[in-house]
Amino acid sequence: ILLDGLYSQSLLPFGGTVNIQRDRIATLSAGVELNWTLLDFGRRQAKDDEFRNALLASNFMFNRSLQDVVHRVQINYFQLESAQGIVDASQQDLLLSESVLASTEERYVVGLATMPELLVARQSRELAGFELEAARTSQHEDRSDLLIAMGLVPGVPIAFELDADAPLPDALSIGVERLIELAMAARPDLAASMAEVKQAKAAVHAAEAQLNPKVDVVAGVAYNWIDYSLSPVTDLPDHGQGHDSTWSVGLLGSWVLFDGEERTNRIRAARAEQMAAMERMQLARLNAAGEVWDAYFQWEAANKQFAWAESLLASSTANLEATMASYEVGLRTMPEVLAARRALADARQAFITSRAQVLTTSSDLIHATGDLRIDG
């Protein structure tokens, strides 16, 4: 849209050197001009491809960010579940310590236990109480971490359903090589790296297209008004008005022949960025393969450790029961009872932490592959 106005006045001599005539002229012009690129030899297409792939890369990274959030929430949930299990185990350990202390006190009263045995039993009970409070503190910290991972204030009163008896994930029926192939195809951040490579390639084409000419279609239409007056009057007419319309259409070609190698340097920079994008993509693929590899074998190790922890818990429970029975008939000493109780407490903690490790490594493996549909 064009809008142009002009007002001018001039002083002109007439009929001698002392006679001055004032000439006033006012003009106004309004119109529309259209410019349409007819040929640009790939400029617009290259720019379209560049921005389209940039948008795709952003969308893929957004999807990966969502997966990161889900992964953090899962990990913190499993940690909270483990902390709750340790609190429950510590409470059982405290109850057992109190039971041992009560039994020792009864035996001390009738002369079947010594004062050192009684003091050791009390010491064991106090240690169990201390460990229970430490477990509760850790539980509060894990709850706070989970709420923060969910985007909530730590003090929000939310009751989480923690099921320590929930079944563990099934064993995988595919190997680590197949999981790596799945990650190469499913991870959004790798798709974003590929989109960035395509974006850099389109940027090279856009830079190369600047070497070519450009042809535009130009069209315009305008309406013009004019008003003038003369003072003093020396010849008629001394004033007047007029208007008319104008239009134009044509082709406009442009071609930069020399720019001090500015365009050439832009092409070199675009090609260098393309090579860098390809290297970043290759590095991302290697890192993804490494993450899947590590997560897979950590998951395998966690499952084996959990199996040993189950056996350890069963053996420690049986050992404590046998030791207590022998202690009641005088075949075991108090230090042996406390050692068996300590071994059971350690076995419970190993069972709880190894179970949480199985869940955590399962979540790590799913996150490393980028596919939430892994079902074995």
Task: Annotate each language-model stretch with its function.
Residues 235-244, 257-260, 266-267, 289-292, ...:
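Short, contiguous acidic/charged loop-to-helix segments that flank catalytic cores in large enzymes
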Residues 9, 154, 350-376:
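Acidic, low-complexity, intrinsically disordered peripheral segments
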Residues 1-36, 161-173, 205, 218-255, ...:
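Small/polar, glycine/serine/threonine/aspartate-rich low-complexity segments that form flexible
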Residues 1, 32-50, 59-67, 71, ...:
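A glycine-/polar-enriched beta->alpha junction
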Residues 113, 117, 152-230, 236-238, ...:
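Amphipathic alpha-helical coiled-coil scaffold segments and their short linker/junction regions
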Residues 314-338, 366-376:
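A glycine-biased, small/acidic residue-tolerant capping/turn segment at secondary-structure junctions
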Residues 48-50, 55, 62, 80, ...:
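Heptad-repeat amphipathic alpha-helical coiled-coil interaction surface used
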Residues 65-182, 295-298, 302, 322-325, ...:
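Periplasmic alpha-helical coiled-coil/stalk elements that build and connect Gram-negative outer-membrane
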